[in-house]
Amino acid sequence: MEPISNVEDPNSSEGDEKRWPDGPKRKRKNSTCSVKSMSALSLSVQGYIPSYLEKDEPCVVCGDKATGYHYRCITCEGCKGFFRRTIQKNLHPAYSCKYDGCCIIDKITRNQCQLCRFRKCIAVCMAMDLVLDDSKRVAKRRLIEENREKRKKDEIVKTLQARPEPDSSEWELIRHVTEAHRHTNAQGSHWKQKRKFLPEDIGQSPRAPTPDGDKVDLEAFSEFTKIITPAITRVVDFAKKLPMFSELPCEDQIILLKGCCMEIMSLRAAVRYDPESETLTLSGEMAVKREQLKNGGLGVVSDAIFDLGKSLAQFNLDDSEVALLQAVLLMSSDRSGLTLVDKIEKCQETYLLAFEHYINHRKHNIPHFWPKLLMKVTDLRMIGACHASRFLHMKVECPNELFPPLFLEVFEDQEV
């Protein structure tokens, strides 16, 4: 739709201001008011003006302010639209002039005589052959859309190419972290073949109520404690194999391990979520259902780990990505009581940068893969915090002799 100031009135025969060959100007009623209002509207809507136009360059048809090069002429939007509609709808044979085709066309009179305006368009050499019919216009729009999509794809490719991949030192770091994970990850890639399902009758009959309304099945809890010590030991061994961790003071190492132990064990369980059996495989050997893990002592923490497992299944993480995620969790500089906070923070940044570059190298198809994966760090930190609170309830409700010494050593005295 043309701006109000540029719309011609097909039923109008008199000009706002019209000249005749041998007569003075005639004024149309209310012409001053209408011209003022239209001028105000034109001034209020400042369209895009191409850089190749000089300031206030006039339209060659009516003298109004030009907006660009249209149909081989410098014209305003009104004359461009008038010329296009005239050709597309073949209106010019029906145009007529009451004054023998002698009207002067300017920005005031342009809407009063269509014939003279069209003749002026032809006189200044506006090109009729450049006006597209409906089929050509649709084809042009389709071509514009195709080019726009191509540019988008080219930009994506360019962005992907611009994303840095690991350098030689980062590849070496990734190799060390991946090997540390593989050497301490029970059953490795063969966990599905070697897992054993916890009998369904275990963990389905909770007996001891806890203060928060959940219940603990002591038989299931006892089964879980059998695998907890080797699981914790493997996390400790993983940390000791990491570059930079052994350089930290012993006190800081202990704090970091206590803080991340549940988070890393939860991650290792979550990446072994099996949607077919709806189970997690703990410590690479015991497959459990959601209710069994919940009734066996973890309560709502069980839901969080299972939900994480379902989510991570879409990411298709490889060993290096799981290993780097564990390293990032381990090197969390916000653990309470640390002495070398700055050094630990720099260590984590080193792992994060190598991690991001490795993600660039892998070229996952999931949009915004890297920020989405980093959100899983937050989820795992929440699981660790919830487990610290849950541990207090388990201590109250379960016999002390069921707790392995290493389990108590790691999880007692944690901040809730």
UniProtKB/Swiss-Prot annotation:
Domain of life of the source: Eukaryota
Family membership: Belongs to the nuclear hormone receptor family. NR1 subfamily.
CDD domains on file: NR_DBD_TR (cd06961), NR_LBD_TR (cd06935)
Chain residues that bind Zn(2+) 1: 59, 62, 76, 79
Binding site for Zn(2+) 2: 97, 103, 113, 116
Any GO BP: retinoic acid receptor signaling pathway
Ranges where the NR LBD domain occurs: 169-413
A GO CC annotation given for this chain: RNA polymerase II transcription regulator complex
Record carries keyword Transport: no
DNA-binding region of this protein: 59-133
Entry text on domains: Composed of three domains: a modulating N-terminal domain, a DNA-binding domain and a C-terminal ligand-binding domain.
Keyword Oxidoreductase: no
Main location: nucleus
Region (Disordered) residue spans: 1-30
Gene of this entry: thra1
Zinc finger feature spans (NR C4-type): 59-79, 97-121
Record key words, sorted: DNA-binding, Metal-binding, Nucleus, Receptor, Transcription, Transcription regulation, Zinc, Zinc-finger
InterPro entries: NHR-like_dom_sf, Nucl_hrmn_rcpt_lig-bd, Nuclear_hormone_rcpt_NR1, Nuclear_hrmn_rcpt, ThyrH_rcpt, Znf_hrmn_rcpt, Znf_NHR/GATA
SMART domains: HOLI, ZnF_C4
Protein name (record): Thyroid hormone receptor alpha
